[in-house]
Amino acid sequence: MAISQELKASLVKKYGGNSNNTGKVEVQIAILSAEIESLTKHIVANKKDQISKRGLFQKVSKRRSLLSYLKNTDIVRYRQILKDLDIRGN
């Protein structure tokens, strides 16, 4: 499911530095993580919703590729975003 505009704006401000920096990798990862969390709750409640499940897999894949890019370019920012969003224990 979609996340609210207020949540998205707060994530952009927190991870982007200002409200206009939406292209920063950390911002994109944070927004995808919020959308993944929302979709996960939806899929638990609606087990037969295959279209939403496919959307979830696409978002997870996109986040994985952005995390891989960040890991290869700046390991410090990569570790910080993992810790902030509690994504995985690397």
Swiss-Prot record:
GO CC terms: cytosolic small ribosomal subunit
GO biological process terms on file: translation
Protein keywords: Ribonucleoprotein, Ribosomal protein, RNA-binding, rRNA-binding
CDD domains the record matches: Ribosomal_S15p_S13e (cd00353)
SUPFAM superfamilies the UniProt entry points to: S15/NS1 RNA-binding domain
GO molecular function: rRNA binding; structural constituent of ribosome
Keyword Repeat: no
Pfam families assigned to the protein according to its UniProt record, in alphabetical order: Ribosomal_S15
Matching SMART domains: Ribosomal_S15 (SM01387)
Source superkingdom: Bacteria
Keyword Metal-binding: no
Gene3D superfamilies referenced in this protein's UniProt entry, alphabetically: 6.10.250.3130, S15/NS1, RNA-binding
InterPro entries: Ribosomal_uS15, Ribosomal_uS15_bac-type, uS15_NS1_RNA-bd_sf
Assembly mode: Part of the 30S ribosomal subunit. Forms a bridge to the 50S subunit in the 70S ribosome, contacting the 23S rRNA.
Known role: One of the primary rRNA binding proteins, it binds directly to 16S rRNA where it helps nucleate assembly of the platform of the 30S subunit by binding and bridging several RNA helices of the 16S rRNA.
Family: Belongs to the universal ribosomal protein uS15 family.
UniProt xrefs under NCBIfam families: S15_bact
Name under which the protein is recorded: Small ribosomal subunit protein uS15
Gene: rpsO
